[in-house]
């Protein structure tokens, strides 16, 4: 319907394409909310006062921000509209939104050049979302346009936290972020399967669940 095709993001109406294999933020935001919140709470506890944190796009990320103590001062770096709106709610957060071309399906701003704002930043910690995690294929997502900023964070942040609910286990999506060994922590809502437990032990990845 026309109503479904015109979601409201941050007070603005945007037209978005729809296909069975394409990630749409508006479709995902009501799925597995309790599970996402549980994983997010584990991850939020890793942030320390006065740190700079990178926050990925996706529907789990705002729950990480929601779980951060309102008394904690920090700097939040983001490139998606829904993440920026969540950061605005934290009274002691200095929010940095990286601008660029807007993509409505996942509400991200893709920088026209990574040499703009991002080249001046070196986050203490980075929080990532993914649509799939697999022991062989690593962390993957739906949209190729997310990869430049995700890869920037993976190369420039000092500590890396992958935050996923259990529905992402064993899934492989088209856009590859990287090996699971690139992450220091994987936070989820339930205990991962034995294969992932074994990989985490081998690669010294901390698991939070």
For the regions a language model picked out, list residue spans one by one.
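Gly/Ser/Thr-rich loops at beta-strand to alpha-helix junctions
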Residues: 59-62
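Short beta-strand element of Class I
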Residues: 74-77, 95
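HTH-adjacent hinge/linker in prokaryotic transcriptional regulators
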Residues: 1-54, 66-71, 88-92
């Amino acid at each position: 319907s026309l109503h479904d095709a015109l979601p409201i993001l941050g007070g603005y109406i945007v037209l978005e394409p729809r296909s069975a294999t394409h990630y749409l933020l508006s479709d995902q935001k009501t799925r597995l909310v309790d599970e996402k919140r549980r994983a997010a709470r584990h991850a939020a506890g890793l942030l320390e006062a006065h740190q700079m944190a990178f926050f990925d796009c996706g529907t789990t990320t705002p729950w990480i921000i929601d779980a951060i103590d309102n008394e904690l001062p920090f700097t939040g770096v983001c490139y998606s509209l829904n993440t920026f709106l969540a950061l605005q709610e934290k009274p002691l957060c200095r929010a940095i939104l990286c601008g660029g071309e807007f993509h409505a399906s996942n509400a991200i701003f893709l920088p026209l050049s990574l040499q703009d704002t991002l080249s001046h930043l070196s986050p203490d910690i980075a929080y990532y979302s993914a649509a799939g995690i697999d022991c062989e294929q690593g962390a993957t997502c739906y949209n190729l346009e997310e990869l430049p900023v995700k890869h920037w964070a993976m190369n420039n942040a000092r500590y890396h936290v992958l935050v996923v609910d259990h529905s992402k286990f064993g899934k492989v999506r088209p856009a590859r972020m990287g090996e699971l060994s690139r992450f220091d922590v994987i936070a989820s809502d339930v205990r991962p399967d034995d294969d992932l437990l074994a990989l985490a032990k081998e690669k010294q990845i901390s698991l939070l669940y």
